[in-house]
Amino acid sequence: MDMREVYVVAGSFVGFQLFFSCVSPVLSSNFTQGYGKLPPNKLNDWNSRLVSTVHALIVGLFCLYILWYDDAVNEDPVWGDPNLVKLNVAITCGYLFYDLLLLACNWSTMGDVFFVCHHLAALYAYGYVLTRGVLPYFANFRLISELSTPFVNQRWFFEALAYPRTHQLVVANGIAMAVVFFLVRIAVMPPYWAKVFGIIYSPTFEKLGLAIQVAWIISCVCLDILNIIWMYKIARGCYKVITGKLKGRKADSKKTTCVNNHTD
């Protein structure tokens, strides 16, 4: 691994930690009235999710830029120049280390086995990208999934502030979350795996070596299984929110009808 990537990983780790400890509390208290009323355990969760949103926007938008404009990576997905991809992956690795430390320090209130599995699988695969510079296209492609994170976090923010599930903002965010999550984590699976199988049955795959082959395929399978599980949970939640909204409208309609038909 080049020293540039080491510095970026370390800087990312420290930067996100400072954002969690110093920046998020100030921003949240100034722009959100309900922030100061949250219990300590929810304050930590709030700050961590704001950091998560910032990371997702940085990495997700950088990922799209690389997909659109980095011809070297797009033309050679296995051995293309990984310069920009390694920078993006290094930012993500720093964030993942920060988040794992945060989960370990607050396991009783924030611990989640799925997130730990997700982070470890990602670090395992991204380690080869940083050290060997291989598979830049596929590493960057996986980061598209981060674009769904802001909507997931926003749902939690609404719940923490006690917004009713039938509130228009909650419903709109829930629908947007389900749609974006499906597009960037589920709908991309067929083209991604089509590209993967195109590489597997070529001499290029053999040149990678067994260790990289295993790291690449197993981590992708694990991440996609987790994404399918999360998609199922999100779809169920979105369905409940939409049906709850419809039931609320029907109830209001019945009340209005009863009032209009009332005679003294």
Curated annotation (Swiss-Prot):
Xref: Pfam families: TRAM_LAG1_CLN8 (PF03798)
Keyword Plastid in annotation: no
GO cellular component, one term: endoplasmic reticulum
Cell location: Membrane
GO biological process: lipid homeostasis
Keywords: Membrane, Transmembrane, Transmembrane helix
Signal peptide: none
InterPro entries recorded: TLC-dom (IPR006634), TLCD (IPR050846)
Transmembrane segments: 6-26, 50-70, 84-104, 110-130, 169-189, 210-230
Record's bilayer topology term: Multi-pass membrane protein
The TLC domain, residue ranges: 41-243
Domain of life of the organism encoding this protein: Eukaryota
SMART domains on file: TLC
Family named by the database record: Belongs to the TLCD4 family.
Name this protein carries in UniProt: TLC domain-containing protein 4-B
Organism whose genome encodes this protein: Danio rerio
The organism's taxonomic lineage, starting at the top: Eukaryota, Metazoa, Chordata, Craniata, Vertebrata
